[in-house]
């Protein structure tokens, strides 16, 4: 523990962020091409869930997307694009829920008055728009795949390298 204090700064280097952005973009492309699309959503095994959870540890590397690494792992386990993406969205729910409720709790400890109706309206609108966007995203990736996201990640990584030098 003590030896690791401050070590996170070693991996927050712009080169590492740029290269991991490119690397995981290319890995997404490979996984998308390699996926056999054979494993149904209902037959998720403990072993598959464990590997997908373990893969999320790679998201600690700056430039690695937690959602992307979840999708990559699920694709390599032969899940479809849609199922892999649903895994990524479902695994975000606990994190987003914790953030939401911790913000609500912290609002309760502020000295200013809170308009709870506004909080409810904003939360409802956020949920509905997210639900709509997820539906659009799932339809989109089923039709065109992940190639646009791969191109985006590779170009972003190259741009970051360009900025670094």
Model-predicted regions and their roles:
Residues 22-40, 101, 105, 131-136, ...:
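Transmembrane helix exit motif
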Residues 1-11:
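Single conserved hydrophobic/aromatic residue that forms the stacking wall/gate
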Residues 3, 99-136:
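Selective hydrophobic functional segments
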Residues 3, 57-65, 157-165:
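Hydrophobic alpha-helical transmembrane segments in multi-pass integral membrane proteins
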Residues 19-27, 54, 94-101, 121-129, ...:
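Lipid-exposed faces of alpha-helical membrane segments in multi-pass integral membrane proteins
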Residues 130-155:
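Interfacial loop-to-transmembrane junctions
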Residues 21, 41-57:
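Small-residue-enriched transmembrane helix starts and helix-helix packing motifs
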């Amino acid at each position: 523990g003590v030896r690791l204090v401050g070590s996170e700064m070693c991996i927050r280097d712009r080169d590492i962020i740029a290269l991991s952005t490119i690397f995981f973009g290319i890995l997404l492309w490979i996984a998308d091409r390699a996926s056999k699309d054979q494993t149904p959503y209902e037959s998720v095994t403990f072993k598959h869930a464990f590997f997908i959870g373990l893969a999320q540890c790679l998201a600690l590397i700056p430039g690695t997307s937690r959602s992307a690494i979840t999708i990559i792992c699920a694709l390599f386990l032969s899940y479809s694009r849609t199922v892999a993406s649903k895994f990524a969205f479902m695994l975000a729910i606990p994190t987003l829920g914790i953030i939401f409720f911790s913000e609500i709790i912290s609002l309760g400890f502020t000295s200013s008055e809170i308009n709870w109706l506004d909080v409810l309206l904003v939360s409802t609108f956020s949920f509905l728009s997210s639900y709509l966007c997820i539906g659009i995203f799932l339809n989109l990736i089923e039709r065109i795949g992940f190639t646009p996201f791969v191109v985006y990640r590779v170009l972003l990584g190259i741009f970051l390298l360009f900025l670094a030098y």
